[in-house]
Amino acid sequence: TDNADNPEKVRQNIIEVALDYLSVGLDPAKSTLFIQSQVAELCELAFYYMNLVTVQRLQRNPTVKAEIALRGFAEGAAEGDTTQRQGIPVGFFTYPISQASDITAFRATTVPVGEDQEPMIEQTREIVHKFNAVYGETLVEPEILLPENAACMRLPGTDGKAKMSKSLNNCIYLSDTAE
């Protein structure tokens, strides 16, 4: 959902992420790298999941609420108000559902995340539970793996904000120079 209005930036990000994965030792002979948006089945699965989640449940997700605030989305921003971004994009708002399809499609049993992502995985578990109740025991309910080491916890952004994030443009990339 980041840079949806800038396809060239999306293409560049894909290349940069792939290079980052390779630079930290991910071996393409042992791991499959793919572009999520090129796997239509992930979108289809998310579409089914959307019928299992209410708008109210998405609104209560602490991660979604925090990201809305960080990105400056305003639900009722007045037309022409340049101090806030206009509305919350549906793709952004339903990201927890998309993330659930990413996790469940590949039958992930454990998902390593930071503490801030715990509500997203909990929502995935809720979706799995509802799906399995309707369609039978089909999906794997993933476990959350949180870091034990405090040094692995959330890093502050380069701008001093609480969270380092590529979408907030306040992070350090593996490809950055020492400066």
Task: Please report, for each region that a protein language model flagged, where it lies by residue.
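N-terminal Rossmann-like or analogous alpha/beta NTP/dinucleotide-binding catalytic cores
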Residues: 1-100
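Active-site cores that bind ATP or allylic diphosphates and position pyrophosphate for catalysis
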Residues: 65-179
